[in-house]
Amino acid sequence: MHKAGFVNIVGNPNVGKSTLMNQLVGEKLSIATFKAQTTRHRIMGIVNTEDTQIVFSDTPGVLKPNYKMQEMMLQFSESALADADILLYVTDVVEDPEKNMDFLEKVSKMSIPVILLINKIDESDQKTLGNLVTKWHGLLPNAEILPISAKNKFGVDILFKRVHELLPESPAFFDKDQLTDKPAKFFVSEIIREKILRYYDKEIPYSVEVVIERFKEDDRQIHISAIIYVERSSQKGIIIGHQGMALKKVSTEARKSLERFFDKKIFLETFVKVDKDWRNSQKELKHFGYSPE
């Protein structure tokens, strides 16, 4: 008997969905930073054994859209409700359980198994956790509730075992040697964007999109050319920095991470261009890959 299924991870921004995804898959596929709204796309990570295939899916945090880009991100999250065999709803110990009742209402009506994960329990106490469990039981009475700490891997093995038990009988959906549904270029752009998220403040990281113009690989090295798009000329100056030092720092850190990711020598070129108000342009969003399949 072979088991396979789509296990989709949803929840509000900054509750630890991407950290959990990376722990479950055993690879760093999703950006995880302290900033909210880090994940923009739906990213699949595939775990294979001889008789199972688990297709985990990380999604953008659910939020009220302010831009067309965020509308697209919300569509990624809602599509994860539609095709899930098992749903992992992630919250944490400080989030108000009633923060996003519209989305929660959709989750409560689902007929598939739902596991409610209360993350970051290392930052809480037993009384607070107990009160949260009671509150969540009232909001999602049909969900299983599991306290975890994704960062510290606490409860992750228990979760993985439970997911395996709940998987439906099915043939594999992907080749057994496949790790993700995304191409190499996608992870290059995400790694560069992660460095921008870490090194720039305020609105700058959220106004950035990274496009890989060139990706040429041989046995020993990879040559990459990346364009960092911003919305305004003033943002371009901030990204580049005085005498190009800020961009150089980001590029150097990105290159180091890329060399670890691909286990090859990386030659990375980065350029900065202005694409005015791209976050509200349907045409540009489609060009940048923000179209749910």
Feature locations, PLM:
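Conserved G1/Walker A P-loop phosphate-binding module
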Residues: 1-75, 79-81
